[in-house]
Amino acid sequence: MKKTLSIALILIMVIALAAGCGGNDSGTPASQPPASAPPASQPPASSPDAQQPAPQPAAPGNDQPQGGQEPAAPAQPAPAGVPELAADAAKRAQDAYAFIANLKQQASAYDKNAAKYKYTLNCQDPAESASGEFLYAWSDAVLAATEGAVYIDIGVSNAYCAGGTMEALNYMKDGLVDFCFTLPCYFKGYTPLALAIQNPALGIKNITVGAFSMWEMYKSMPAVQAEFAQHGEMMFVWANNPSPLSYKGNKELTSTSEIKGNIRGNNGPAQMFIDEVGASVYGCPIGDVYPNVSNGVIDYLITDWHAIASFKLADPGVLNYYLDTNIGCSAYVVMANSDVWKEIEKNGYADAIKSVSGDYCLNWVSIWEAYEAKGRSDAVNNGGTIYPPTGAFATELQTAFDNVAQRWISENGANAQAVYNKTAELVNSYNAIYK
């Protein structure tokens, strides 16, 4: 009964997403957020002891080997090229969970503990997050694609990075962890061109648009590929949900002149926006945001709906106002240590792992749509106010966004204009497809 209820809640959530949670920059208030979302106590879809939030219950994944079970069919070769997803956000989220369920079932044919090669991957986010679910699913895909030979152990909540989130990429580069999941914007100067995706002037409507645009931009721009290549071997780079401007306050904003004090935002365009409105940049790891907002240290927050849901930032006493426009989504990346990747190539598993990385990962990236629905639902259910900018305020914001884009282009070298133009072209194209 509990499992049936959990599945029903997910289906309610994804249907509600289509009805009330479109793109953040659409100018339409999110007046009817979903009534339900993934329960906070429920483990991620592919993590140990999870109840699979998919339309149909799935067999246990690689973390639950079954004695005497009929082996599932090995993973099929990955389809070539970028997949086509549903135009409707609710259907995309539903399909993504179904895809994860299939990966889990394929992985159940193999025992992770018997894998010949075991590697570690550090993730800043908790298990109960889109990032956690996404990475557990990728680990399942790798286990199945290598026929049980390679297992990637996902260390959520910085389990393998004692130095904290800001050290994740360096931990991977130095060989202290084999793979990493992180945000390029945490590392100022490491991959400046990749931060083009964060420009709010692009008007990214949702996670699916951001993810497809970021990945396609990376594939088409050698200058961006070169930035990442100096740090490790690329598995996948995409973008998260759009970010509202959130705060603990007592009224709606009506002008950019009211945006003052300390704002937590990532490197690149987000911090340029903070400069543009005359506020102060306040840096801290995402795990420290909850107390810093509660205690009034942070006045405003630029972070995505997924993080609002995963880190419980909509709890009473934390955030309660959400300016519903995209101040900027952030890039995500999964990379391998260069020496580790050479070892994987030597052992003959590089092609198998790459077959379930990159384009293939786009098949389940839309689980972030579900977490946006949860973030919005949490906000309203806890008494928060989600509102769009209107009139002169909307015009002021657009001017600020345009100024940020021009500054970003001027400060990022000869390739910046071409990278920005390509990113804008992709965003416009995918905005027309994925609502």
Q: Predicted regions: what is each one?
A:
Residues T28-A73:
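Post-signal peptide N-terminal segment of mature Sec-exported envelope proteins
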Residues M1-I7:
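Positively charged n-region of N-terminal signal peptides that target proteins for export
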Residues A16-G20:
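C-terminal motif of bacterial Sec signal peptides marking the signal peptidase cleavage site
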Residues G22-D25:
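Bacterial signal peptide processing site
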Residues I204-Q230, G391, Q406, S410-G413:
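Short, solvent-exposed loop/beta-turn-alpha elements that line the ligand-binding surface or hinge
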Residues A50-Q52, Q64-E70, P77-Q94:
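Helix-enriched interaction subdomains in cytosolic or periplasmic regions
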Residues G81-I204, M234-K435:
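N-terminal secretory/targeting leader peptides
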Residues I7-V14:
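Sec-dependent N-terminal signal peptides
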